[in-house]
Structure formats: structure tokens, C-alpha cells
């Protein structure tokens, strides 16, 4: 779960239902990420907190250049490893996150998502659990046609995706305090996008220079090429379903080439007055010798049930819908 607050209300409910939990939040934030697990089956083996603002993505330059960030966001990734009581020596690694929300900061979300995968793989290796599957799920704040999604699942970048990355290679005043606030960024089309709305345009930022350390397009592609490709549980699972009446997917409303991944994600995972899109995913990284099988999925909400917006009584208590999957892994001999 992401954007979790009111722990004094939530934790007793989880405990009554037989769940233990691990909670983590960014510095100074009043909400965070929570992973709950059944106490009868799992116990906490190890944890790791990933602070995206502090993570380095290159080895050259000063500390800011090595981090290569465009915005100090205070977002985190929370990694935990769980021992399975029912299978001796087995377990699962779970990573959850809430990436930076601003729709124009495509580069920063790509940076954060790449760091999350890198650190999840590193964490699994550091605790000698390479044979355990890794589930990476959360609110990624990007749609299936976003550059970050394509980079994660191994699709080549399209020209418009490269353009969104290039125009978001900026440095915000939160990283460089010498930048005056409310200075417009280098996105040429901002004049046509209601520039008075800071939630839809880049402000208080300047174009990145080479000394800022932001990855160039070839460097970003190379960064992701060194990472394992993620598999989306819903994209694969819904792609195998054809007998659910009224089921529509992201590809039903957004044209994607047949070869592109993401077309079978739910049509929406968030449906509010301001945002109607897909933001949430369940990804998996399988161990080398243990392929996964999708046994069942929680059916997405029908769009007709979302048109009045969420949260909505009887539909969803959150402005995001729930995603759930039952998975199995079989170890090859």
C-alpha cells in the first residue's frame, strides 16, 4: 500500500486479521509505504529503505552529479524479504514504492524506477536470496505508454517517449537553490498548457547541463539495459483473458502497437476529477530457475462503475483501485 497514513486506525485492523506489517516513509512525509503479510506464513527476514534523492546513478563528478537527479522529491522505495514458514529455505522479496507524482517530470520517474529495480536486485543478492522471487508493486505515477514503463519492461523507446525524457531533463530549485522560484522550464509547449497551473507544467527549474549529471538518452538506455526486465502481472494476465463481459484495458482507449507491452493493463487504476489514468502495477522478477505462473487476478473495475469518480461508496474507498494477484513459482530441478 502507498500513501498510507492514520496508522493508529489501520494497524489494529491488520493485526486483528492476522497480518504483520512493515512501514516506511520519506523524510518529513506524513504518509508512506506499507507491506502487510500473514503471520502464519511469513516472518520478516530483512529490510532496506531506498531514498531516491540520495542514490547515485553514475561514478563521476561531485555528489550532485553522481546522483543525477532533477528534483528533490523525498520519495522512497521500501524493500523487504519474507521467510516462508511453509517452505523451508524459501521466501519472497517485496518492493513497493510511490514515485514522484508531477506528470511532466518523466526523467525523474524513469531515474527512480531504474534505481528501485537496481536496488531490489542488489538487496536480494546481499541477503543471499537470489533464488527467491521478487514482487515490485506500487504507485509508479506513469501510464503504460510512458517512457519509464517501456524501459522497465524492455520495449524500445518511441520518438515521443524520447522527447518527453529530453524536455524533462531539468534541474529544479530543490536541487539547485540558486534557481529563482516560478521560472518556467524549457518545455516549449507550456504556453499552450495553461501555464498558470504548476501541476501541469515545469516551473522553478532550468535546463540541465553536463555538470548536473543527469543521464543522457544513451546513458539512460544503457542504465536500464544492465537491469533485468520486469514482467507485468496484469498486462500478461489480462492478455490471456477473453471471456470477461465488459472488460476493457488500457489498449482499448489508447492506441499501442500490437508488439508493445502495456496494452493489457487495466483501463484505469485511478479515476478522479483531475486524473483518469493507469498509475499502479504489479511487476515480478523471477529467479533464474523458478518460472512464475499467474493463477488468478482481481478483476479490474468496469469503467462504467468509475464514471462518477473515486473514492466512491460501494466502489472504492481510495482514489486508486486495488490490484491483486495469486502467483505460484515452481523451482526447476
Residue ranges of predicted features:
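Structured beta-strand-rich core segments of catalytic domains in phosphoester-bond hydrolases
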Residues: 1-101, 314
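Eukaryotic short linear interaction motifs
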Residues: 7-9, 29-30, 43-45, 89-90, ...
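Amphipathic alpha-helical interaction motifs in eukaryotic regulatory proteins
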Residues: 10-11, 15, 37, 110, ...
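Short coil/turn segments at secondary-structure boundaries
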Residues: 12-14, 47-50, 106-110, 147-151
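Metal-dependent phosphoester-hydrolase catalytic domains
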Residues: 121-135, 141-333
Amino acid at each position: 500500500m502507498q500513501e498510507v497514513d492514520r496508522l493508529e486506525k489501520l494497524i489494529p485492523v491488520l493485526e486483528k486479521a492476522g497480518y504483520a506489517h512493515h512501514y516506511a516513509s520519506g523524510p518529513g512525509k506524513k504518509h508512506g509505504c506499507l507491506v502487510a503479510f500473514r503471520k502464519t506464513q511469513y516472518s520478516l527476514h530483512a529490510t532496506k529503505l531506498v531514498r531516491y534523492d540520495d542514490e547515485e546513478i553514475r561514478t563521476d563528478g561531485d555528489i550532485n552529479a553522481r546522483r543525477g537527479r532533477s528534483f528533490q522529491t523525498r520519495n522512497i522505495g521500501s524493500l523487504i524479504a519474507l521467510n516462508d514458514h511453509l517452505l523451508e529455505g524459501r521466501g519472497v522479496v517485496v518492493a513497493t514504492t510511490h514515485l514522484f507524482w508531477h506528470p511532466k517530470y518523466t526523467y525523474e520517474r524513469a531515474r527512480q524506477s531504474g534505481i528501485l529495480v537496481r536496488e531490489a536486485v542488489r538487496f536480494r543478492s546481499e541477503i543471499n536470496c537470489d533464488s527467491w522471487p521478487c514482487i515490485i508493486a506500487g504507485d509508479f505515477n506513469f501510464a503504460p505508454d510512458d517512457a519509464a514503463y517501456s524501459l522497465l519492461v524492455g520495449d524500445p523507446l518511441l520518438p515521443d517517449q524520447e522527447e518527453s525524457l529530453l524536455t524533462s531533463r531539468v534541474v529544479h530549485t530543490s536541487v539547485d537553490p540558486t534557481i529563482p522560484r516560478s521560472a518556467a522550464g524549457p518545455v516549449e509547449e507550456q504556453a499552450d498548457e495553461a501555464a498558470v497551473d504548476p501541476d501541469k507544467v515545469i516551473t522553478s527549474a532550468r535546463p540541465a547541463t553536463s555538470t548536473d549529471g543527469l543521464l543522457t538518452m544513451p546513458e539512460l538506455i544503457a542504465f536500464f539495459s544492465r537491469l533485468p526486465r520486469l514482467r507485468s502481472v496484469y498486462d500478461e494476465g489480462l492478455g490471456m483473458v477473453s471471456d470477461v463481459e465488459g472488460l476493457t484495458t488500457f489498449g482499448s482507449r489508447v492506441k499501442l502497437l500490437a508488439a508493445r507491452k502495456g496494452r493489457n493493463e487495466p483501463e484505469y487504476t485511478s479515476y478522479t476529477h483531475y486524473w483518469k489514468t493507469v498509475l499502479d502495477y504489479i511487476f515480478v522478477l523471477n529467479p533464474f530457475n523458478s518460472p512464475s505462473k499467474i493463477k488468478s487476478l482481481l478483476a479490474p473495475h468496469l469503467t462504467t462503475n468509475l464514471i462518477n469518480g473515486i473514492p466512491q461508496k460501494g466502489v472504492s474507498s481510495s482514489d486508486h483501485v486495488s490490484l491483486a494477484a495469486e502467483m505460484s513459482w515452481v523451482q526447476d530441478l
